[in-house]
């Protein structure tokens, strides 16, 4: 089945198109992004159960972006009050106040050109087997409870076994003078984890996740994920400490993805090029890896949780080759940063929610597959480690 596009947004579209036309008389550029996303979050352990109709990506609202004389401003609202004429007048009034404050405080703002607005009409509904808003939550809680109980029996020294999941049916609509874009897709994530002490009393917690562009059917994979926890727990309980030093390592796809995202990906988010906060700008066209290393970034790279059709600035999703056989070719870029740098946007302008500013953010950051088998790679290492699985990886930085 297709993830159905929001009837609410379809009903809102005519008034928003009228709003854009009204504001277009006062500004050099006008667009509006509207979202309507529904879903759930679920957590089940031996001691607690939690079910919520909200998660990090459930939302409903709109944000207007305008440009005049090189200055961009935004106005966000949850519901469209009154007539488009009244809202247009309120937006003009509020944004003029913002500009007055900037003038009074002497804030130096970026002067940016007008965003391109090539004509485009796009409607995308992605495939899913089930919808989060129609999921039988009672049955899902019962299933997770049974899995938690099974985990307690399977995993040695388990003090608890927890399962968490979230699923969201996302609808987004982008309207400008010449563009009318609509998309809907479902993404789902689930994790099972067990907790238990080693002989020194340190808590070890093996975990395994499932995720993808699809509905709650993805959570069916948690049964197999749970079966992997006992072996991992046994290895964690018996693992010794590594003697500090330098070693050759082989990384599994999970660790390789972590390195690609945290150690490299953030450094080529090009809004940081604008602010001179990223070393990546100094390495474009230079060697940053071996001939075997080619890396892609983009929502089109894989049907994962970020496999959208267009980003939050109305730019179509892309597949960017960031590293080509070891040479850094480019980074990723939101639309405004692209204008300031004189490059093309890559479809990576993302908002935490509709009311937040769009930043350059990653989607799928992946290495191309190589030609060598794992056994060959292991045979090439005299002494080292095979790294599998991670517990964290957040690079702390301020946009």
Spans of features found by a protein language model:
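Active-site bordering "gate/hinge" segments
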Residues: 1-308, 315-318, 324-327, 385
């Amino acid at each position: 089945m297709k993830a159905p596009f929001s009837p609410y947004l379809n009903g809102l579209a005519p008034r928003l198109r009228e709003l854009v036309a009204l504001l277009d008389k006062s500004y050099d550029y006008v667009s509006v992004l509207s979202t309507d996303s529904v879903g759930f979050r679920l957590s089940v352990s031996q001691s607690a159960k939690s079910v919520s109709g909200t998660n990090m990506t459930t939302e409903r609202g709109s944000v207007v972006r305008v440009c005049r004389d090189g200055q961009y401003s935004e106005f966000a609202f949850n519901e469209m009050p009154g007539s488009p004429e009244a809202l247009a007048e309120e937006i003009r009034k509020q944004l003029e106040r913002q500009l007055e404050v900037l003038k009074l405080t002497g804030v130096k703002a970026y002067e940016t050109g007008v965003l391109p607005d090539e004509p485009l009409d796009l409607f995308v509904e992605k495939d899913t087997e089930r919808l989060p808003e129609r999921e039988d939550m009672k049955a899902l809680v019962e299933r997770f409870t049974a899995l938690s109980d099974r985990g307690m029996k399977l995993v040695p020294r388990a003090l608890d076994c927890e399962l968490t999941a979230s699923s969201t049916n996302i609808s987004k609509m982008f309207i400008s003078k010449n563009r009318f874009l609509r998309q809907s897709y479902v993404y789902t994530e689930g994790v099972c984890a067990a907790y238990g002490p080693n002989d020194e009393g340190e808590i070890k917690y093996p975990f395994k996740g499932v995720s993808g562009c699809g509905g709650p059917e993805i959570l069916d994979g948690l049964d197999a994920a749970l079966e992997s926890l006992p072996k991992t727990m046994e290895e964690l309980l018996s693992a010794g400490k590594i003697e500090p030093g330098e070693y050759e390592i082989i990384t599994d796809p999970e660790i390789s993805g972590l390195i690609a995202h945290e150690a490299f990906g953030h450094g080529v988010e090009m809004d940081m090029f604008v602010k001179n906060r990223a070393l990546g700008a100094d390495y474009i066209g230079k060697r940053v890896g071996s001939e075997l290393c080619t890396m892609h970034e983009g929502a089109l790279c894989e049907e994962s949780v970020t496999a959208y059709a267009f980003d939050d600035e109305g730019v179509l999703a892309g597949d960017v080759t960031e590293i080509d056989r070891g040479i850094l070719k480019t980074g990723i870029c939101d639309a405004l940063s692209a204008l300031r740098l004189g490059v093309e946007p890559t479809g990576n302008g993302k908002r935490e929610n509709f009311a937040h500013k769009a930043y350059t953010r990653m989607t799928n950051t992946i290495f191309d597959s190589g030609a060598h088998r794992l056994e060959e790679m292991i045979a090439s290492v005299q002494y080292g480690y095979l790294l599998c699985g991670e517990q964290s990886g957040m690079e702390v930085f301020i946009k």
